[in-house]
Amino acid sequence: MNVTIFNVATGKVESLVSGREEDINAMLDGGQDCIEGHFYPKDFYINAGEPVAKQAQPTPNHIFNYVTKQWEDPRTLQELKDAQWASIKRSRSQAEYAGFMWDGSTFDSDAVSQNRITGAVTLAQLSSAFTIDWTLATNQVRTLNQSEMLQVGAALGVHVQTQFAKGQSLRVQIDAATTQAEVEAIVW
């Protein structure tokens, strides 16, 4: 016999057991009962002796409340704000490293590419005769002169600063939020 043992007061599934009926009944304490079949605690609770499927867990942080029969996020407002800010920073980095456009060409902007652009800008500042064949994000090659290389460097700077300015604006909104819903509404 396969059964699910549950807490009668809350409906929380406490264990799944297989065995003889008399052995299973001997395992039950005063606040427990069982129903036939295996209903996994991650997916079910018991209501009036019947298994009820839980809704999908919204996030790994949510905990099922057996009184309200709903998923709840137990984090404090500050913990929610900290988590949202961490998410915003990840999105900001992704946007920063996703590349940028200048004069119809897409340039890489990951950390290594930013260093390469900075180095090329430094070289361009040393000679008005500067030229370089630059491999674009599309793997096409574009020849840049001194003026163009300096403009690419400036465009990179604007691109990075734009991402950080957006992040700073979102941080102000996160700090000002007073409810979980307000915090969750702030996205990249």
Language model: regions and residue ranges:
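Metal-dependent nucleotide-binding catalytic modules
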Residues: 29, 34-42, 46-47
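A preference for well-ordered globular domain cores
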Residues: 2-30, 48-188
